[in-house]
Protein backbone atom coordinates (compact mmCIF):
# COMPACT_ATOMS: atom_id res chain seq x y z
CA UNK A 1 0.00 0.00 0.00
CA UNK A 2 1.47 3.34 -1.02
CA UNK A 3 -0.04 6.79 -0.43
CA UNK A 4 1.60 10.18 -0.93
CA UNK A 5 0.59 12.81 1.59
CA UNK A 6 1.70 16.26 0.49
CA UNK A 7 2.66 17.96 3.73
CA UNK A 8 5.24 20.28 5.22
CA UNK A 9 8.06 17.95 6.10
CA UNK A 10 10.82 17.63 8.64
CA UNK A 11 12.89 14.48 8.55
CA UNK A 12 14.88 12.98 11.38
CA UNK A 13 17.11 10.42 9.76
CA UNK A 14 18.92 7.43 11.13
CA UNK A 15 21.72 6.89 8.62
CA UNK A 16 24.13 3.96 8.71
CA UNK A 17 26.60 2.39 6.33
CA UNK A 18 23.76 0.86 4.32
CA UNK A 19 21.62 3.99 4.62
CA UNK A 20 19.23 2.55 7.16
CA UNK A 21 17.11 5.56 8.02
CA UNK A 22 14.69 6.54 10.76
CA UNK A 23 13.05 9.70 9.53
CA UNK A 24 10.74 12.16 11.26
CA UNK A 25 8.81 14.57 9.09
CA UNK A 26 6.76 17.64 9.87
CA UNK A 27 3.06 17.75 9.03
CA UNK A 28 0.08 19.79 10.26
CA UNK A 29 -2.21 18.29 12.87
CA UNK A 30 -5.76 17.86 11.55
CA UNK A 31 -7.82 17.97 14.74
CA UNK A 32 -10.93 15.81 14.34
CA UNK A 33 -12.06 14.11 17.53
CA UNK A 34 -13.52 10.61 17.44
CA UNK A 35 -15.81 10.86 20.46
CA UNK A 36 -15.84 8.59 23.50
CA UNK A 37 -14.40 5.07 23.29
CA UNK A 38 -16.75 2.12 23.63
CA UNK A 39 -14.65 0.63 26.44
CA UNK A 40 -11.31 1.09 28.15
CA UNK A 41 -9.00 -0.60 25.67
CA UNK A 42 -6.08 -0.47 28.11
CA UNK A 43 -7.69 -3.48 29.79
CA UNK A 44 -7.97 -5.42 26.54
CA UNK A 45 -5.58 -8.09 25.39
CA UNK A 46 -2.90 -7.03 22.94
CA UNK A 47 -2.46 -9.25 19.91
CA UNK A 48 0.48 -9.26 17.56
CA UNK A 49 -0.47 -9.39 13.89
CA UNK A 50 1.19 -12.37 12.15
CA UNK A 51 3.56 -11.62 9.32
CA UNK A 52 4.03 -7.93 10.10
CA UNK A 53 7.17 -8.10 12.26
CA UNK A 54 10.21 -6.83 10.36
CA UNK A 55 13.53 -7.72 11.98
CA UNK A 56 16.28 -5.14 12.19
CA UNK A 57 19.14 -4.99 9.76
CA UNK A 58 22.52 -6.13 11.03
CA UNK A 59 23.40 -8.51 13.84
CA UNK A 60 21.03 -8.90 16.74
CA UNK A 61 21.84 -7.42 20.13
CA UNK A 62 23.78 -4.39 21.20
CA UNK A 63 27.26 -5.85 20.97
CA UNK A 64 30.43 -3.87 21.48
CA UNK A 65 32.08 -1.87 18.73
CA UNK A 66 35.62 -1.87 20.07
CA UNK A 67 38.12 -3.04 17.47
CA UNK A 68 35.57 -3.12 14.67
CA UNK A 69 33.37 -0.82 12.65
CA UNK A 70 30.35 0.67 14.41
CA UNK A 71 27.38 -1.68 14.37
CA UNK A 72 24.52 -0.98 12.02
CA UNK A 73 21.32 0.35 13.56
CA UNK A 74 18.99 -2.34 14.85
CA UNK A 75 15.40 -1.69 13.73
CA UNK A 76 12.30 -3.83 14.17
CA UNK A 77 8.72 -2.96 13.27
CA UNK A 78 5.80 -4.91 14.76
CA UNK A 79 2.09 -4.33 14.14
CA UNK A 80 -0.22 -4.92 17.12
CA UNK A 81 -3.93 -4.74 17.87
CA UNK A 82 -6.02 -3.88 20.94
CA UNK A 83 -9.75 -4.29 21.52
CA UNK A 84 -12.34 -5.14 18.90
CA UNK A 85 -15.17 -3.73 16.79
CA UNK A 86 -15.65 0.02 17.28
CA UNK A 87 -13.05 0.03 20.05
CA UNK A 88 -10.32 -1.66 18.02
CA UNK A 89 -6.89 -0.01 17.93
CA UNK A 90 -4.15 -0.87 15.44
CA UNK A 91 -0.65 0.39 16.12
CA UNK A 92 3.00 -0.20 15.26
CA UNK A 93 5.98 -0.55 17.60
CA UNK A 94 9.34 0.49 16.15
CA UNK A 95 12.35 -0.51 18.27
CA UNK A 96 15.52 1.36 17.26
CA UNK A 97 19.08 0.97 18.58
CA UNK A 98 22.07 2.90 17.24
CA UNK A 99 25.75 2.86 18.13
CA UNK A 100 26.17 6.62 17.57
CA UNK A 101 23.42 9.12 18.37
CA UNK A 102 24.66 11.50 15.69
CA UNK A 103 23.44 8.95 13.17
CA UNK A 104 20.05 10.50 13.94
CA UNK A 105 20.05 13.28 11.38
CA UNK A 106 17.47 15.84 10.27
CA UNK A 107 16.49 16.51 6.67
CA UNK A 108 14.23 19.34 5.52
CA UNK A 109 11.79 19.39 2.60
CA UNK A 110 13.78 20.52 -0.43
CA UNK A 111 16.69 20.84 2.03
CA UNK A 112 15.38 24.25 3.07
CA UNK A 113 14.52 25.55 6.53
CA UNK A 114 11.47 27.80 6.86
CA UNK A 115 7.69 28.01 6.82
CA UNK A 116 5.25 26.75 4.17
CA UNK A 117 7.80 24.53 2.43
CA UNK A 118 6.06 21.39 1.20
CA UNK A 119 6.97 18.07 -0.38
CA UNK A 120 5.71 14.50 -0.28
CA UNK A 121 6.72 11.93 2.30
CA UNK A 122 7.79 9.55 -0.45
CA UNK A 123 9.93 12.13 -2.24
CA UNK A 124 11.85 13.21 0.86
CA UNK A 125 12.31 9.62 2.00
CA UNK A 126 13.49 8.63 -1.47
CA UNK A 127 15.93 11.52 -1.75
CA UNK A 128 17.54 10.44 1.52
CA UNK A 129 17.33 6.71 0.81
CA UNK A 130 15.14 6.33 3.87
CA UNK A 131 14.36 2.89 5.22
CA UNK A 132 11.88 4.16 7.81
CA UNK A 133 9.93 7.39 8.25
CA UNK A 134 7.37 8.76 10.74
CA UNK A 135 5.91 12.13 11.80
CA UNK A 136 7.94 14.79 13.54
CA UNK A 137 6.86 18.12 15.02
CA UNK A 138 5.12 21.39 14.21
CA UNK A 139 7.97 23.86 13.66
CA UNK A 140 6.84 25.17 10.26
CA UNK A 141 3.64 26.62 11.71
CA UNK A 142 5.41 28.69 14.33
CA UNK A 143 7.68 31.67 14.48
CA UNK A 144 8.80 30.93 18.04
CA UNK A 145 10.35 28.04 19.92
CA UNK A 146 13.73 26.32 19.84
CA UNK A 147 14.71 24.55 16.64
CA UNK A 148 17.94 22.52 16.50
CA UNK A 149 18.63 20.12 13.65
CA UNK A 150 21.82 18.08 13.30
CA UNK A 151 23.57 20.26 15.84
CA UNK A 152 22.63 23.51 14.05
CA UNK A 153 20.57 26.15 15.87
CA UNK A 154 17.94 27.53 13.47
CA UNK A 155 15.63 29.31 15.91
CA UNK A 156 16.13 30.49 19.48
CA UNK A 157 12.88 32.05 20.68
CA UNK A 158 12.02 30.06 23.85
CA UNK A 159 8.35 29.68 24.85
CA UNK A 160 6.47 27.95 27.67
CA UNK A 161 6.36 24.65 25.73
CA UNK A 162 8.22 21.52 26.78
CA UNK A 163 10.57 20.39 24.05
CA UNK A 164 12.22 17.04 23.44
CA UNK A 165 16.03 17.04 23.33
CA UNK A 166 18.06 14.25 21.71
CA UNK A 167 21.69 14.60 22.79
CA UNK A 168 24.91 13.60 21.06
CA UNK A 169 25.65 11.08 23.83
CA UNK A 170 22.51 9.08 22.97
CA UNK A 171 20.40 10.31 25.88
CA UNK A 172 16.99 11.94 25.65
CA UNK A 173 15.38 14.54 27.89
CA UNK A 174 12.62 17.14 27.98
CA UNK A 175 12.95 20.74 29.09
CA UNK A 176 10.63 23.73 29.35
CA UNK A 177 11.95 26.13 26.76
CA UNK A 178 11.61 29.31 28.81
CA UNK A 179 13.98 27.89 31.43
CA UNK A 180 16.84 27.64 28.95
CA UNK A 181 17.85 28.77 25.45
CA UNK A 182 18.71 27.12 22.17
CA UNK A 183 22.34 28.10 22.56
CA UNK A 184 22.47 26.64 26.07
CA UNK A 185 21.03 23.35 24.80
CA UNK A 186 23.49 23.34 21.92
CA UNK A 187 26.38 23.93 24.32
CA UNK A 188 25.09 21.02 26.45
CA UNK A 189 25.30 18.68 23.47
CA UNK A 190 21.82 18.85 21.94
CA UNK A 191 21.76 17.22 18.50
CA UNK A 192 18.06 17.53 17.63
CA UNK A 193 15.21 19.33 19.40
CA UNK A 194 11.51 18.67 18.69
CA UNK A 195 8.67 20.82 20.01
CA UNK A 196 5.16 19.39 20.25
CA UNK A 197 4.10 17.43 23.36
CA UNK A 198 2.87 16.65 25.85
CA UNK A 199 5.35 14.63 27.87
CA UNK A 200 3.69 11.22 28.32
CA UNK A 201 6.07 9.38 30.65
CA UNK A 202 8.71 10.64 33.08
CA UNK A 203 10.78 8.64 35.55
CA UNK A 204 9.15 5.49 34.19
CA UNK A 205 5.62 6.56 35.15
CA UNK A 206 2.75 8.03 33.15
CA UNK A 207 2.49 11.75 33.74
CA UNK A 208 -0.56 12.81 35.74
CA UNK A 209 -3.28 14.85 34.07
CA UNK A 210 -3.09 13.26 30.63
CA UNK A 211 -6.90 13.14 30.48
CA UNK A 212 -7.04 16.92 30.74
CA UNK A 213 -7.52 19.00 27.62
CA UNK A 214 -4.28 19.64 25.76
CA UNK A 215 -4.12 22.17 22.95
CA UNK A 216 -1.41 22.84 20.42
CA UNK A 217 -0.57 26.40 19.40
CA UNK A 218 -2.89 27.60 16.66
CA UNK A 219 -5.50 24.88 17.24
CA UNK A 220 -8.75 25.62 18.99
CA UNK A 221 -9.58 22.09 20.09
CA UNK A 222 -8.12 19.61 22.54
CA UNK A 223 -6.11 16.72 21.10
CA UNK A 224 -6.28 14.61 24.27
CA UNK A 225 -8.95 12.15 23.06
CA UNK A 226 -8.51 9.06 20.85
CA UNK A 227 -6.51 10.12 17.79
CA UNK A 228 -3.90 8.84 15.35
CA UNK A 229 -0.56 9.20 17.18
CA UNK A 230 3.18 9.27 16.75
CA UNK A 231 5.37 9.28 19.87
CA UNK A 232 8.91 8.43 20.96
CA UNK A 233 10.08 6.69 24.13
CA UNK A 234 13.51 6.35 25.73
CA UNK A 235 14.74 2.88 26.75
CA UNK A 236 18.38 3.81 27.38
CA UNK A 237 21.34 5.47 25.66
CA UNK A 238 20.93 5.09 21.87
CA UNK A 239 17.82 2.90 22.35
CA UNK A 240 14.38 4.25 21.46
CA UNK A 241 10.82 3.01 20.99
CA UNK A 242 8.56 4.71 18.45
CA UNK A 243 4.79 4.17 18.46
CA UNK A 244 2.65 4.88 15.40
CA UNK A 245 -1.09 4.56 16.04
CA UNK A 246 -3.69 4.56 13.27
CA UNK A 247 -7.03 6.22 14.02
CA UNK A 248 -10.35 7.69 12.87
CA UNK A 249 -11.16 4.41 11.09
CA UNK A 250 -14.02 2.61 12.86
CA UNK A 251 -13.58 -1.15 12.98
CA UNK A 252 -9.86 -0.90 12.12
CA UNK A 253 -8.49 1.63 14.59
CA UNK A 254 -10.07 4.43 16.63
CA UNK A 255 -6.73 5.83 17.78
CA UNK A 256 -5.35 6.24 21.31
CA UNK A 257 -5.72 8.92 23.94
CA UNK A 258 -2.65 10.10 25.85
CA UNK A 259 -3.21 7.78 28.81
CA UNK A 260 -3.40 4.74 26.54
CA UNK A 261 -0.29 5.84 24.68
CA UNK A 262 1.65 6.37 27.91
CA UNK A 263 0.58 2.95 29.20
CA UNK A 264 2.24 1.18 26.25
CA UNK A 265 5.51 3.02 26.84
CA UNK A 266 5.47 2.20 30.56
CA UNK A 267 4.80 -1.48 29.84
CA UNK A 268 7.89 -1.55 27.61
CA UNK A 269 10.08 0.00 30.31
CA UNK A 270 10.52 3.47 28.84
CA UNK A 271 11.68 6.01 31.41
CA UNK A 272 10.61 8.96 29.25
CA UNK A 273 8.13 9.36 26.38
CA UNK A 274 7.01 12.34 24.33
CA UNK A 275 4.09 12.90 21.97
CA UNK A 276 4.90 14.10 18.46
CA UNK A 277 2.71 15.48 15.68
CA UNK A 278 -0.27 13.21 15.01
CA UNK A 279 -3.77 13.30 13.55
CA UNK A 280 -4.44 13.09 9.84
CA UNK A 281 -0.76 13.21 8.95
CA UNK A 282 0.31 10.07 10.88
CA UNK A 283 2.28 7.94 8.44
CA UNK A 284 4.74 5.07 8.75
CA UNK A 285 6.95 4.74 5.69
CA UNK A 286 9.27 1.78 5.24
CA UNK A 287 11.41 0.76 2.28
CA UNK A 288 9.41 2.71 -0.28
CA UNK A 289 5.95 1.86 1.06
CA UNK A 290 3.40 3.38 3.42
CA UNK A 291 2.83 0.43 5.75
CA UNK A 292 0.18 1.86 8.07
CA UNK A 293 -3.26 3.16 7.10
CA UNK A 294 -3.28 6.97 7.25
CA UNK A 295 -6.77 8.22 8.03
CA UNK A 296 -8.77 9.83 5.21
CA UNK A 297 -8.30 13.58 4.88
CA UNK A 298 -10.24 16.15 2.90
CA UNK A 299 -7.17 17.21 0.95
CA UNK A 300 -3.51 16.35 0.92
CA UNK A 301 -2.64 19.81 -0.32
CA UNK A 302 -1.63 22.63 1.99
What spans do the regions from the language model cover?
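Conserved, well-ordered active-site substructure
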Residues: 143-160, 165-166, 216-271, 281-302
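A short, polar/proline- and glycine-enriched secondary-structure boundary/capping micro-motif
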Residues: 114-117, 183-189, 219-221, 251-257
Amino acid sequence: MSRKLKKMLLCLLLIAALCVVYELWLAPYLAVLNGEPVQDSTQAEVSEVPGITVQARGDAGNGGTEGKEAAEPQISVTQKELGMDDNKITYFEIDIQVSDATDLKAALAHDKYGQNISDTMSDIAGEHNAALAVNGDFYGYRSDGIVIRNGVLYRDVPTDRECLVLYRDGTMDTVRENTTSGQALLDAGAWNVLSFGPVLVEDGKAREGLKEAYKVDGLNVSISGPEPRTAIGYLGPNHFLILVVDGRQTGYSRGMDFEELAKVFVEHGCTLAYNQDGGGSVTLYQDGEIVNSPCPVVSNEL
